[in-house]
Amino acid sequence: METVVNQIKSKLPENLEGLLDLAYNYWWSWNRRATKLWEKIDPEHWWEYKNPVKLLLDTPEERLKELSKDDDFINLYELVIDQFRHYMNPESTWFSTNYPKWEEPVIYLCMEYGISKSLPIYSGGLGILAGDHIKTASDLGIPLIAIGLLYKHGYFKQEIDKDGKQIEVFPEYNPEEMPIKPLTTEKGKPLLIEVPIEDRIVYARAFEVNVGRVKLYLLDTDVPQNSPDDRTICDYLYNAEIDKRIKQEILLGIGGMRLLRMLGIDPAVIHLNEGHPAFANFQRIAWYMEEGLNFLEALTVVRGTTIFTTHTPVPAGHDKFPIAEVEKRLAKFLEGLPKDEFLNLGREGDQFNMTLLSIRTSSYVNAVSKLHSKVTKEMWRHLWNGVPLDEIPVEGITNGVHTKTWLHNEIKKLVDRYIGRVWRDYAELEGLWYGVERIPDEELWEAHLKAKREFIELIKRKIKERNERLGIEEPLPEIDENALIIGFARRFATYKRATLILTDLERLKKIVNNPERPVYIIFGGKAHPRDEAGKEFLRKVYEVSQMPEFKNKIMVFENYDMGSARAMVAGVDVWLNNPRRPLEASGTSGMKAGLNGVLNLSVYDGWWVEGYNGKNGWVIGDESLEPETEKDNIRDAQSLYNLLENEVIPTYYENRARWIYMMKESIKSIAPRFSTHRMVKEYVDKFYSKALANAILLQRDSFKATREIASWKAKIFNSWDKVEIERIITHDATGVEVIVNLDGLSPEDVKVEIYYGVKAEGYAIEKPYVIELKHPQSLGGNRWLYRYEGNALKNLGHPCWHYAVRVYPYHDKLPHKFLLGLIKWKGFFEL
């Protein structure tokens, strides 16, 4: 790699030397002027690769000398370099202003990152979200360090054959041509970390990726010190082989922590983005045990300082492995450690569940939308058996998108002109975006048409490349930029229902072939290599697109990636999203589209439950939150056709003023609320800051608080089975007495409460009231009498009201009162 840097250095003219540092920092990927600068060097090369390191390597020295004398290029270069230096060395940031004494890093771990097309280590929404998260952490000045894996073949490059069958192509990427650098020792040799897997040590090298002010470290086992098989651990993202998948997750979690230690970084607070990296907490527990803590004490520290984000209710998104397979691959790591206690953290019958491990080792758990929070609580409520759903400690922090990455350049220009550049630092301020109203309709429409033209050119280019590869000789489609274009692009997972719009082909034929109001529908997306049902959906869409009545009206393009996504989310008129509720935990593609004034046509699920306001798009089906089944497909398809025929198409063609009004409404309502600036600030305020406070508390005075809390937990676990609410005695509607047997616990170890309110379904209570019972009287023999007098009991006996008493363990140093998931109940009239 050093030779690559030297190669570039040796041919850069002196007045263009700044291009080297710029090329190795992904800041350029969200800066309009910087991408324009790279494009000026070689437009065709930039279109193909979007990789400044490869661009500089491949550009002849003569061309660089020519540019060094080009006044226009030099002026742009100096402007970009000046912006870059100011960004990297700010006087202050949001974080430094709001948390001036915070220096400890937050460690962020994820299996994939979508930073740019030139770093193909992502497959879909999880990776794109992770990329947007760390870009925003950079913008806000958060001391965040990210860890991932470097995949030799990435995910896969998609080709579609003449029959519509997906072909997975796995190109081999050369790290030396990427904007990444290897970490080296003082002697210039590759820095290697040692990761115990099975009965041996596996070595991994590390690469550093600069994402603005944030460091992303990527691990890879393709080094000569490893066996041929171990060298292939990082060959493929989401390797379907159980053996490789477990090893990848050990490498990410345990290896990631060991890399930090080699770099002298203390992982005081960590954020697990999905369950894949959860073995990181095994390593942290082991290290704390080396410092003299027992297992429960070490777990207390680790759990109190870990954040876990779960992204999907779909079972395929929650890794499970046979526990024997996990034990085999952790054999060397677990030597000398209490094996069963470690494995029990993820044990689910004979399976080891990575999500379960993540939850059991995290104090701060969140889903990625408000609806997904409810779904997640229901999905995992057995871990908090008896705790009311609304009190289960799973927060909803709705996803967002990195505005500077996803806002189209033409829209950026308008926003700069009519709102001011301040949005770049304060994208989450809702009042700011009301300035969109100042944009003249004709200017917004022209900017939108430019985005459409760009996307149309991309589609034609992709179709041409495919035709040439397959030897297909036919004219390219003529796509009218003034016609309505509907876009559908995402993973071809069956629950996303790509074929829903194909339910009634006769009706669809009339919709797309109206000569006065033509409609194009453009599909993009990959099916997982092992998802045969998803591949069949893709084949079905392609098959319909080749029917004479749909030819060049419905189109499918290959290899949907970040580059095509950026063009598509701004270059269509309508963004179609029709998953089966509630399986779309959040979804972010619609946010990106809405940000650009593209109108969402979506099922009421995920983020759209919060985003839809009646003026910024349409809802397919109803606004219910009830789960859907396959039986609802016909209903939703009919709703989709009705909306297209009666609202979407007529508005687009007959009421342009209304359409542009909705575009502005979309931008101003979606841009601030669904920005990662809002999202990441929520993580800092709600989770990171509290986890850091816990880290300080738990490690202070040689882990004094840790030992106290762990000792208390052990006492609770030992006595809880025998704790009992023995009796409830009511005195008309004025008072109640409760007798509780606390076994070996004291009243200070628990809270006893009256819980009451209007009955809802089953035993649920709508908007419950809680009264804590205090000052108990000892009855001897571990039995305590709690009393209450007051008017809260006035509805006692009413058939619509329910009263109960509950008792649960309580410690004021726990992050959540229900962290242990223990609670006992007794209804007032139970016999």
UniProtKB/Swiss-Prot annotation:
Residue list for modification N6-(pyridoxal phosphate)lysine: 592
Enzyme Commission identifier(s): 2.4.1.1
Induction pattern: Expressed constitutively.
Molecular function terms from GO: glycogen phosphorylase activity; pyridoxal phosphate binding
Temperature dependence comment: Optimum temperature is 98 degrees Celsius.
Root EC class: transferase
Record keyword Repeat present: no
Reactions the enzyme catalyzes: [(1->4)-alpha-D-glucosyl](n) + phosphate = [(1->4)-alpha-D-glucosyl](n-1) + alpha-D-glucose 1-phosphate
Cofactor(s) required, per the database record: pyridoxal 5'-phosphate
GO biological process, one term: maltose metabolic process
The keyword Magnesium is annotated on this UniProt entry: no
Superkingdom of this protein's organism: Archaea
Entry-linked Gene3D superfamilies: Glycogen Phosphorylase B
UniProt keyword terms in alphabetical order: Allosteric enzyme, Carbohydrate metabolism, Glycosyltransferase, Maltose metabolism, Pyridoxal phosphate, Transferase
Function: Phosphorylase is an important allosteric enzyme in carbohydrate metabolism. Catalyzes the phospholytic cleavage of maltodextrins with a minimal chain length of five glucose residues to yield glucose-1-phosphate. Low activity with tetraose and no activity with triose and maltose. Long maltodextrins (8 to 15 glucose units), amylose and starch are not as good substrates as maltoheptaose.
Subunit-structure text: Trimer (at 25 degrees Celsius).
Family: Belongs to the glycogen phosphorylase family.
Protein name from the UniProt record: Maltodextrin phosphorylase
